[in-house]
Curated annotation (Swiss-Prot):
Cytoplasmic domain ranges by topology: 2-8
Reactions the enzyme catalyzes: Release of an N-terminal amino acid, Xaa-|-Yaa- from a peptide, amide or arylamide. Xaa is preferably Ala, but may be most amino acids including Pro (slow action). When a terminal hydrophobic residue is followed by a prolyl residue, the two may be released as an intact Xaa-Pro dipeptide
Extracellular topological intervals: 33-967
Protein name: Aminopeptidase N
SUPFAM superfamilies noted in UniProt: Leukotriene A4 hydrolase N-terminal domain, Metalloproteases ('zincins'), catalytic domain
Amino acid sequence: MAKGFYISKSLGILGILLGVAAVCTIIALSVVYSQEKNKNANSSPVASTTPSASATTNPASATTLDQSKAWNRYRLPNTLKPDSYRVTLRPYLTPNDRGLYVFKGSSTVRFTCKEATDVIIIHSKKLNYTLSQGHRVVLRGVGGSQPPDIDKTELVEPTEYLVVHLKGSLVKDSQYEMDSEFEGELADDLAGFYRSEYMEGNVRKVVATTQMQAADARKSFPCFDEPAMKAEFNITLIHPKDLTALSNMLPKGPSTPLPEDPNWNVTEFHTTPKMSTYLLAFIVSEFDYVEKQASNGVLIRIWARPSAIAAGHGDYALNVTGPILNFFAGHYDTPYPLPKSDQIGLPDFNAGAMENWGLVTYRENSLLFDPLSSSSSNKERVVTVIAHELAHQWFGNLVTIEWWNDLWLNEGFASYVEYLGADYAEPTWNLKDLMVLNDVYRVMAVDALASSHPLSTPASEINTPAQISELFDAISYSKGASVLRMLSSFLSEDVFKQGLASYLHTFAYQNTIYLNLWDHLQEAVNNRSIQLPTTVRDIMNRWTLQMGFPVITVDTSTGTLSQEHFLLDPDSNVTRPSEFNYVWIVPITSIRDGRQQQDYWLIDVRAQNDLFSTSGNEWVLLNLNVTGYYRVNYDEENWRKIQTQLQRDHSAIPVINRAQIINDAFNLASAHKVPVTLALNNTLFLIEERQYMPWEAALSSLSYFKLMFDRSEVYGPMKNYLKKQVTPLFIHFRNNTNNWREIPENLMDQYSEVNAISTACSNGVPECEEMVSGLFKQWMENPNNNPIHPNLRSTVYCNAIAQGGEEEWDFAWEQFRNATLVNEADKLRAALACSKELWILNRYLSYTLNPDLIRKQDATSTIISITNNVIGQGLVWDFVQSNWKKLFNDYGGGSFSFSNLIQAVTRRFSTEYELQQLEQFKKDNEETGFGSGTRALEQALEKTKANIKWVKENKEVVLQWFTENSK
């Protein structure tokens, strides 16, 4: 599953006005929430068609039930193993007489008894069963075996089981089949078998689609819903005759009319390979497609709304899919396992994308690309998300993790090799370099907290769906990607690929744990006689079984290296023990005065080597191209030499390492390892820098300063400094783009141009402010002809709305409502949060929970856009505090990301009062709980304490530095 805005100018503290508006927002949004809750209450699952006294449901909490009973535990017992399923589903795309959208289905599961048992436990969620002889299922033997009679069946809601109690025991090694007929709601909750809606002209269209990961296949049909319970699936869909049915495999033949109703067709699909339930997909829609046959014979199709396909929005995805599939087939030394690769863009989809085997589902903005209206960053997102999902077709689908505690291996691997696949499809973009900014530094911000967690968690600690959901975080995706990139680097890509191919060949159609990969990589190392300080397993266990990462400190006067666990707050209490005592086996790469040196391994807390000692004006720099997952600190003299080199000729240092110098120093300053002025001094050379990565590293690092100080007197001098530094970059792009009429050829230059405009406008460069307001005014005068290049729209929209008022906001809102391309709608939706008008933000916040105005899948990100605006943060925080219980109860199982919301709304917290509010918020809502936001709340408390300390220590010196250096 794939991972995946601009902030307006500050207005300072608005005091009483903010409080009054927040109360208004609370009242307005409470009404919206009540409406949504009532709608949800009226949309509960349909009643059983044949109710019976013996068909009981157990609603008690699993924590209060007898844990000695297998059905009260979240993990399936090992007594039964599924072999195959026959599933028929019929979604109704118009509401019934109760106003509900429903689907009906039947299922036959064949399973083998591995241990004698008198109970069948299978997952089932929100399904209502048709009773047969008083029971929800019919059981029969296969191959002459005789099944015991059924005593009773029950639904255990807390653990989401259908439990079949038997009067005798199933026989070990015997096969059985179990039939059921059921009905469920085709809800708009973005989970399991659900419905998505969109407008085609003035007509509302409905799509039946799926999202099974992690634990929602059970919401579509009864199944053994764990990744290790692989089986073959025979899917049949009954659907309106004018619609198309899709699933993981191709149809066996043309659809045939349903005998009892010719308005319906029956589509039967070929049997799937042995696979996990979470990778199943089935879709009924009137979508259209474009297709081509790959050189290896695989059928490639891109599906989307007919108007999007007709406009050519699927063409780019079609053109890159074949090359990416071929790349991974070569990279894995394994042919693509299926006869076709369907990819479909859905109007409503909670994740960025989902790697369903042979039928990958996407948000529209992750698959569709319009060259006339989409930006280069939109194009980059499409190619990288496609590469991520196609990487999973082998790593994750063909070979699958045993249990979700190793999710990081699935998602971390795909998050790493997505850059390789995308780079193959777009070789001139240098996409592999972006991983440092997008993943390595992104996750280090979280992994430097005492509340972080290791990549690999013991299986016994991950049981409930909520615990599984918490694993889909930056650690699993981005740290997983970062340490695998480091592993590939010190092994060499060829050795890494050899071990990977062996792993895939050995475990095809099976399940693994992470140690299996280490063992196969070790075999490849042994075959190549590569010298490592110890085994792959020993090295990687340090990076996967303990949280965090080291900071390597270099004393160039002696050549001494030392390592310690890097914590943003060095006084924080690390309560999680580590068998390795937070010592890592670290691959060290380095350059001296621009010349690369031999590689080195730091295996102890401290070591000495002449590679790292200098004399005269020599400087040394560690972690070449940031292939290692660690930060680097130097003695004061070496820092001074690096700064001198940057200001004299920054090109002597590789561009990625120029970004590293900035990012490491700011984080070291946050951790009290270096003075904050040292980190700020590392940005002085930017007045001469034109490359994207160093500037992005600086802006990203300084965004923390903005969060801490945009409500204080520091912010004025800070803006003046940024204005001074960015003006040459702004002028450079103005002159080299014919006064913004042309776009730079190089992708990184295009991104740098956007940074130049965004930074110049938000920090008061008059020419920039005039440019964006002029372009936006031209568009307002002629709405049918947008003069703003797609690359520049996000920043122009945001800054123009920030400078404007109600007229500009209402125009942008109207354009958003009429946008037919999701990428354009996304740009406008984010920019609408840039307003300086409190009442406008208040109104916009009230829109976010009306799905007729803001799609459910976009509600969280829209609220986050508002809270990222200094003016809107108070509105959102007041609302979250006052309405958490309602928010959690109404949306806890749906499309809200509580983790992202908590992280965003607390990002500016830096006062004792805000800490007290946060602690009170936790106390007040302990009974309600925080779901997927539980860990985020603990991290928010830790970050707030660190912020308070940092501001107290640094405010005055930062104010002085910006004042002196902005002249």
